A protein has these predicted regions:
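Compositionally biased, intrinsically disordered low-complexity regions
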Residues: 18, 44-47, 75, 127, ...
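Ser/Thr/Gly-rich low-complexity blocks that favor extended beta-strand/coil architectures
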Residues: 2-3
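Fold-core signature of tandem repeat domains
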Residues: 7-10, 14, 18-23, 30, ...
């Protein structure tokens, strides 16, 4: 497994091409390794075009699309952060090219129970919600989610902006 620091060291040993099978590092470092790709076969540089790549820091849809061009090997994302629609778009990238199946997810725009369920179907990692808006029953359902090992992660609401819809005067009077 190679990191950017390892790759720079390996590349300094030769004027030929270094071929990588596995790379695990932050997005910016993997991108920097990709920039070392030689312009012709066998030339000085680093070839990761067939490498299995794991990106360790949170990435957006734009970064996921960029990373998908780094290699014909599988790109594994450990963490993703973006709007709901963009997270769904990341998951729509064919899973033999790029996967977020076990990624920690942070959704940055407003979601509800239905959207949280969609995200839980896309990853076994924990999901952090920045904003949620739904009725009391659905919010309670989201709050009740727990880790189901190998199936779904927890849904984290501790830092969320929460909006409760469909609150009636009767509900408010009942709690006085």
């Amino acid at each position: 497994i190679s990191t950017f620091a390892d790759v720079i060291k390996l590349n300094s040993y030769t004027n030929g091409e270094v071929t990588l099978d596995k790379v695990t590092d932050k997005f910016a470092n993997v991108q920097a390794i990709h920039r070392l790709t030689p312009t012709e076969d066998g030339a000085d540089g680093v070839d990761l075009t067939a490498a299995l790549i794991t990106i360790t820091d949170p990435v957006s849809l734009d970064q996921a699309n960029t990373a998908n061009d780094f290699s014909d090997g599988l790109i594994t994302l450990n963490s993703v952060i973006d709007s709901f629609d963009n997270l769904i778009a990341i998951d729509a990238i064919p899973s033999d090219q790029l996967t977020m199946a076990n990624a920690a997810v942070q959704v940055t725009d407003e979601v509800n129970l239905s959207k949280v369920n969609d995200l839980r179907a896309d990853t076994t990692g924990n999901i952090t919600v920045d904003e949620i808006k739904d009725n009391k029953v659905n919010l309670a359902a989201v709050n009740a989610f727990v880790v189901e090992e190998g199936v779904a992660g927890d849904v984290i609401l501790s830092e969320s902006d929460i909006t409760v819809t469909a609150v009636s005067y009767t509900h408010l009077r009942a709690h006085e």
